[in-house]
Amino acid sequence: MNRERGITLIALVITIIILLILAGVTISAIFGEEGPIARAQEASFKTEIAKAKEQFDIYVSEKKVLNQEFEIGTLNAGETSLYYNTKPETEIGNIYTVLFNVNKKYVKDFEIIKGEMFYFTQNEREAQWALEMGMKTNPYEIINGVLISSDKNLFLLDEATGTITIPERVKEVGEGTFAGLKGIKRIIIPPTCKRINNSAFNGNDTLEEVLILADGDQGVESIGNYAFKDCIKLKVVSMPNTVRVLGTTVFGNCSSLEKVQLSSRIEVLSNNMFQNCSSLKELLIPNGIREMKGFLLQGAISLINISLPASLEKIDNNCFYDATSSLQNISLDGSNQHFIVKNGMLLSKDEKQIYAVTKGTINGNTFNVPKGITYVGSGTLMPYTNIKKVVLPESVTSIEAGFFPWSVEEIEIHPNNPNYISINKQILSKDKKILYFCYSKELIITLEEGIEEISESALEKCNNAKTINFPTSLKRLKPQSLKGIYNVKNIKLGRNIEEICGEVFLYNFGIQNIEIDSRNPNFIAENAAIYTKDKKKIIAFVNNEATSFKIPEGVKEIKQSAFSCREKLTSIVLPETLTLIENSAFYKCSALPTITIPNSVEKMDGWGIFDDCSALKEIIVDKERGSLNGSPWGCIYGDRAVKWLR
């Protein structure tokens, strides 16, 4: 019967439409915004809004009658939950409990927050109709389940307690959504939220507690890069076993963090995850984790105990970089097949690689690398300032400069070592073509002629040097090869340089100028910047004291890390000829407040172009919205920082 009635109504509507058309009424008049169809939709919608308002008022009145202590400001309701201050523990409910007589088509789009009812819609007509009925809409910015970066999201902050409760309709906390916002002390994330994106809470310097809830297997599955970076008051993090992925530097610089409960479903602990977590004293790595990535614990100077599981298969060589000064105990599951702890050292099972050295292992001022060791990892001895001498055995085949402590005065290499020699406090390859490490404390350092390559961090511990004379034979500067050397202001490179990139100058905060021999066929240096010979690509800008720089017209590409770590720059002007900006181009330009991307740019290659630019709150793009992929390109403030002009 119902089916027949439905068919009859449809036939009637079709008949009316045909008659209207025959009478000369246009299709647009029938179906347009002012047509009868739209008016019928409006009337139906407004009827449901009116019913919702009435039922909400009745529900609130009933609660007040039942208990005079009921506070309307505590009433919250969504698709799966209902809460108010006098709610009995036995009561189960949700938004449908409140709006039981409203068309279910609409009920799911209502939400009660702090005693106010709102309607959520991306339909502009519905939003207007709701407002005409006195119904508030969209109190926070959500698009397709993603809570996006917007100042409107402060509505979710309970100013009395400093608590933000993420609403149930939120499936993802978007990139930079709450980054840098003040007054947040506690965050509650419901099981309905599946993802916390990059920099979501970056720089919340009042945040003390993060509560990530789960309901069985339902809950947050991934937490993005830098999500809680620079939350300097965050003390405790407890995550459910729903979490499978943790991004790089997720807790970086959380200097108050004392305890972390990790999910057992995570397989990889990402780079820099606990970087500079200087209050972290104990870390239990749950079984299930297979890999610990580079610089995972860098600067975790208070770490005393760490427990490693049977499942662990790989540890990056610099995982414990500058993190062992307080380390007293490394506990390793006895069934682990890949590592052993011996004489206070964490070693590979075959005893060929050192990963970490505990505090009690260091006696006296000499450290003898055990015989049989082939690889010495970065940062292993860095915290131990009492070490003056390091002895390397014949077996060592791979050296990283970061292995050695700042205090080292002598490195003795076994005369039968086939790979390395030591000359004038410089560790070189046997053929003298590669410089691996220089530890001279002289004011003027002259590198050996014949050197063709300088390795990563090779000069980092030449912290007294004011002048470094580079050999004319030099061909290649590897990434971070000029890291450190804070007192060297000017660099002169010869005509044979054929490999240099912006990453060479990462974490160098001293250089102010660079000169390259005019006969060099590959590069040219002007005004503290390095370009390809045709000046179409800028490789690096090196002046650490500069506050502004204008890239000359004609430059088409900004290469990777070109402006990285230029922390005093407050203005960078890009040319109208620019077409490409590569990843990390402006990494750690921490004083830069704004930048304009010209219309000529065709590609911004990488999510981390503005990574760690803590002051960057405005990216002006002289193009149509969405015409460049990757927005906001690593800016911690998310899309609220991006202004499209067209």
Task: Give the residues covered by each predicted segment.
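Structural signature of tandem-repeat unit edges
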Residues: 130-147, 158-172, 181-195, 204-222, ...
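Membrane-proximal N-terminal amphipathic helix
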Residues: 35-69
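Short acidic-glycine loop/turn motifs at beta-strand connectors
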Residues: 102, 113-114, 150, 348-351, ...
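Intrinsically disordered, low-complexity repeat and linker tracts
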Residues: 38-52, 118-140, 640-646
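Membrane-interface elements of multi-pass transporters and channels
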Residues: 29, 33-34
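Consensus positions within tandem repeat domains that build extended binding/scaffold surfaces
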Residues: 174-177, 197-200, 224-227, 247-252, ...
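N-terminal single-pass transmembrane signal-anchor helix
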Residues: 4-28
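Periplasmic/extracellular, small/polar-rich flexible segments of pilin-like filament-forming proteins
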Residues: 61, 65-132
